[in-house]
Design a protein with these regions (language model features):
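Conserved catalytic core of the tyrosine transesterase superfamily
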Residues: 1-303
Length: 303
């Protein structure tokens, strides 16, 4: 029956990623029906659906994710109606009320993220400081730290890395020939391999092979010597000076994930972001859908 449901969705010209989401959500529901020994869908009542919702709530799924699943279930019942299996859709008017928490307020746009990188890369040292009076060692350390921070900003903006992932990076995780980076797993995220941007490849080549990293006195094979959490904190404070909208490092990461959702399907974004659970990605997806709906309502208030 699921294969026929897939054909039904394809005939309605849904995107492949959307179809996969509906199939997955309908699958969750049907497994629950089977596990609980419930009646066939044609005999399902509204109260049965409420029991399913309660089950998902007990699993601590948020309101937005549950409503996404209800939407898929509703489409499944519309498919069954067309097949003549059911005469009504008990999920058609079912929606769970509750406050949907946005992942992030005022996310940065793609061009703002790129501008942030380019602006930081070109930033001049504070002109209020008389750099000529500082020792050569201090000036060199400052310049080296700036080069290291350019690498960090790039990894935050193009790969959406958080400090825990940055801390675990080693030189052998960078493949300059393939233009890729391997990101090890952490307690918060899965491992993955992502592409590097052209700008990153050039900077990483200089950083790794040009002696910059070695001068920062790394321990063993670590890519970013020193206390990475401190680096990210103070770097973020500098980035706020370039773009006051920035709240913290997670603000940047969330903006990147939302941008990915405009370009890739949900499963791809889950992999790229290292999310352990698809529900983490769905939280971003719901915010993006709500943003688009709000924009459409502004342009077409009576639509």
């Amino acid at each position: 029956m699921i294969e026929l449901f897939k054909e039904y969705l394809q005939q309605r010209r849904y995107r492949e990623s959307t179809i996969n989401g509906h199939l997955q959500n309908a699958g969750y529901f049907l497994k629950w029906v089977e596990a609980n020994g419930l009646q066939e869908p044609e005999n399902m009542q509204y109260n049965d659906l409420l029991n399913y919702v309660q089950y998902e709530q007990q699993r601590n799924l948020d309101v937005s994710t549950i409503n996404l699943r209800i939407s898929s279930i509703s489409k499944y019942f519309e498919f069954l109606k067309e097949q003549g299996t059911v005469t009504r859709n008990p999920a058609r008017t079912l929606r769970i009320k509750g406050k949907v928490k946005s992942v992030i307020q005022n996310p940065l746009k793609y061009d703002e993220l790129l501008s942030l990188y380019n602006s930081y890369k070109a930033v001049e040292k504070d002109k209020s400081v008389d750099w000529w009076k500082l020792s050569r060692h201090i000036k060199e350390r400052s310049q080296l730290a700036h080069q290291r921070n350019i690498i960090i900003v790039g990894l935050m903006i193009w790969q959406g890395l958080h400090s825990g992932e940055l801390e675990k990076l080693e030189v052998n995780h960078i493949n300059l020939n393939e233009g890729s980076i391997y990101i090890p797993s952490t307690a918060r995220s899965n491992s993955r391999e992502l592409k590097l941007s052209t700008q990153q490849i050039l900077m990483l080549h200089t950083y790794i092979n040009g002696g910059i990293r070695e001068k920062l006195k790394p321990k063993a094979d670590e890519l970013l010597p020193g206390n990475v959490h401190n680096h990210v904190f103070f770097l973020t404070e500098e980035l706020k000076g370039i773009n006051p909208q920035i709240k913290n490092a997670l603000h940047i990461r969330a903006s990147v994930v939302l941008q990915w959702l405009r370009q890739h399907n949900k499963r791809q974004v889950q992999y790229m972001a290292g999310h352990k659970y698809i529900t983490s990605t769905e939280m971003y997806e719901v915010q993006e859908l709500e943003t688009l709906t709000e924009q459409l309502s502004k342009h077409h208030p009576f639509g």
